[in-house]
């Protein structure tokens, strides 16, 4: 797996806390630690418990917990096998059609040989997906359709109107509102 995207590698040995950026050091590691947006985390918990996780679209202003929430969900789903089940990409860096046709399709087209009942699908996390080109989003839609049995996608963006309707319609959408002052303190 390419080591791209945000966040710590949940399945790896912990790094020295002095070397971690502040945002990584204090990022919630579990859904219980995500204190804001309880309605979203409780819905995600129900999806996990029912083994029925859909494609997800998280949108809202920066700093509202979108990335932290999906990383905590992935940690709950996969634990130590996180790295073999999750592909994290920052779409503002990898925004073109070649990434969709190359990295994402290659990851989506393979299955894990030793998967259990609870982790039969992989997860692709596309952060800042509103930076993807229209052509890349159209290619992503086709990959989502073709590999939906094997992979779930979490599309994260600040501006949902920059995500093509064909992708929006294939995802369960969650709006992350700005945090209250007492939630930040």
Where are these regions (language model features)?
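P-loop/Walker A NTP-binding region and its immediately flanking N-terminal helices
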Residues: 1-173, 177-183
